Amino acid sequence: ATNIPPHNLTEVINGCIAYIDDPEIELSGLMEHIKGPDFPTGGVIMGHSGIRAAYATGRGKITLRGRAEIVENKDGTQEIVITEIPYMVNKARLIAKMADLVKEKRVEGIRDIKDLTSRKGMKIVVYLRKGANASVILNQLYSFTQLQDTVGVIMIALDNNTPKTLNLKQMIQKYVEFQDEIVRRRTAFDLQKAEERAHILDGLHRAVDIVDEIIATIRACKGGMAEARQAVMDTFQFDEVQADAIVKMQLGKLAGLEILKIENELNELNAQIKNWKDLLADDAKVLAVVKNELTALRDKYGDERRTSIEHVSGEVDIEDLI
């Protein structure tokens, strides 16, 4: 099953735009924009190697920690203040696990644990005994509880209805191609509707000069709308679509047709039709629309990254060895 962690909208859109601007962009270039997963609960991702492996292959593991700070008190005691916990970790269970570790004496030096979470944000305070080593205790909490968690990444998506594991660039490529298709299909639909409306307006434009004759012909037909439509087609050489639009109009409305109003609408439609045809004939223009729409989405909904990424001592990327 797919398991793609949440990402930052601004970063992902910037990555998509970078790909549109340069389809030959490499993974390292994309990662300048897409730093890594970004969880709504914040936290700290430990190291870049797990992120890079996941983005390069479509599979990987990322180490995620809660955000904790060691606070020195005036009386010489220390506290561990936790303000963020890993994504999908249950706060109550985390605190209960910490308490169990204290009872079992697997972690020593903790005198109390309090949940001081409020509307202002999360806050779990671990009060330490005087002389306790806060750094050691914090590392023990990382090791023995879900204050440090592993997030698996499996980037599986449907490609032509076939499940495939995709790396980051492939995922972005498929998404941009999909957006390209959406713009083309939407434009083709709008173009078709505009051409259909323009065709009817062409008929109405011609009907203005002979409106009295058309009304007389319609009134002379006693066999209903079908007979009137056929009579208009035969007498005035309108096609079926145009004749149908004319016959369906109320006679009073037909008599009051204004040629200037028809011409204005027709001119607007013809300009739109030209623009849409030009767009569909130019791949670069279609991608420009995709880019502009993504930019508008980013500007409206984008926000700052919540999850930070810390370099781990001794971590070496493959590129560093080349």
For the regions a protein language model found, what residue spans apply to each?
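C-terminal interaction appendages of subunits in large macromolecular complexes
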Residues: 2-322
